[in-house]
């Protein structure tokens, strides 16, 4: 289970939480402009946009969970188990395996508008990376500073949906998630007025009562509502530090604590990492479950003209500043 969000202030920010019961050794990874992407059905891509994101590197290949390219386009894959279904290879189509979708789009496209044209010809196939890495059932949030879309491949084909909320979680399919927000249109950051009955002297006895009914559980539909409400009502300031901090607070609204979501006896889903990339500047910030200090990796401080990946292992231990 995961949550992703796109957030526009003075700069454009894109990030996500990764919620799962175990880590796969992911690290912050920069793919330079001349790293040779070898696609299973579409040949090689030897020159492309550089990108930065979180990836598990297997056999020298970056399996990106989320990434942002140097043009400011961001993309994240989130679990879509039970609904995701991929096609068979078809002649005359751009046959791209699901694990290749992030580099296929981010390597070639600078905007969502450009990506839409690519997606029109896309045939998303279930070719696995290897026998050890079967095709993951995913859907994707794709966003730039101007718009966001959700990409879902299902039994009835490939869908690209406008996402005015700029957020994504997991099941059910995106149209149901967006429609469900109708049930929460009365939520407000302001204190409510008594509309129950003029015959009763009802009054607010606490701050925050305008958001009564905002779901607080960890299910994906509830997290969609909560992160959308938090993001769309968040107040922004002027500095990079303040905006990055605010983005982490937005995703903190859906953070999962170890012990609250048991997936099997003794195994618990929790927020392994939270990311926030300033897509305008190419700076990737993250925290981990046991380290709340922000760590940053700058795309433009890496070697971008070479062919070799650059990776940084996550700082996972808590960093405590002692004041005395």
Say what each PLM segment does.
Residues 15, 76-78, 151-152, 285-287:
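Beta-strand residues in well-ordered beta-sheet regions across diverse protein folds
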Residues 28, 68, 149-153, 275:
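Broad, structure-driven detector of short, well-ordered beta-strand segments within folded domains
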Residues 121-159:
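Catalytic cofactor-binding cores of redox enzymes
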């Amino acid at each position: 289970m995961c949550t992703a969000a796109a957030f526009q202030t003075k700069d454009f920010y894109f990030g996500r939480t990764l919620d799962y019961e175990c880590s796969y050794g992911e690290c912050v990874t920069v793919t330079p402009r001349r790293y040779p992407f070898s696609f299973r059905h579409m040949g090689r891509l030897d020159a492309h946009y550089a990108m930065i994101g979180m990836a598990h590197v297997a056999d020298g290949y970056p399996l990106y969970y989320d990434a942002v390219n140097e043009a400011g386009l961001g993309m994240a894959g989130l679990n879509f188990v039970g609904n995701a279904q991929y096609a068979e290879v078809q002649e005359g189509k751009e046959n791209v395996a699901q694990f290749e979708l992030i580099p296929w789009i981010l390597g070639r496209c600078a905007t969502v508008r450009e990506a839409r044209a690519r997606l029109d010809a896309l045939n998303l196939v279930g070719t696995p990376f290897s026998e050890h890495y079967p095709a993951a059932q995913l859907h994707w949030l794709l966003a730039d500073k101007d718009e966001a879309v959700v990409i879902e491949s299902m039994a009835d084909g490939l869908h690209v949906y406008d996402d005015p909320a700029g957020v994504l979680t997991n099941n059910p399919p995106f149209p149901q998630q967006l429609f469900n927000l109708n049930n929460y249109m009365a939520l407000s950051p302001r204190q409510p007025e008594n509309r129950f009955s003029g015959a009763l002297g009802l009054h607010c006895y606490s701050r925050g009562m305008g958001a009564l009914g905002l779901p607080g559980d960890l299910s994906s539909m509830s997290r969609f509502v909560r992160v959308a409400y938090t993001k769309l009502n968040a107040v922004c300031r002027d500095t990079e530090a303040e905006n990055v901090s605010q983005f982490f607070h937005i995703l903190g609204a859906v953070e999962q604590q170890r012990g609250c979501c048991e997936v099997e006896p003794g195994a618990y889903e929790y927020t392994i990492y939270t990311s926030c990339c300033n897509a305008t500047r190419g700076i990737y910030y993250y925290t981990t479950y046991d380290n709340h200090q922000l760590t940053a990796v700058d795309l433009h401080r890496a070697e971008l003209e070479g062919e070799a990946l650059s990776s940084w292992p996550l700082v996972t231990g808590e960093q405590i500043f002692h004041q005395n």
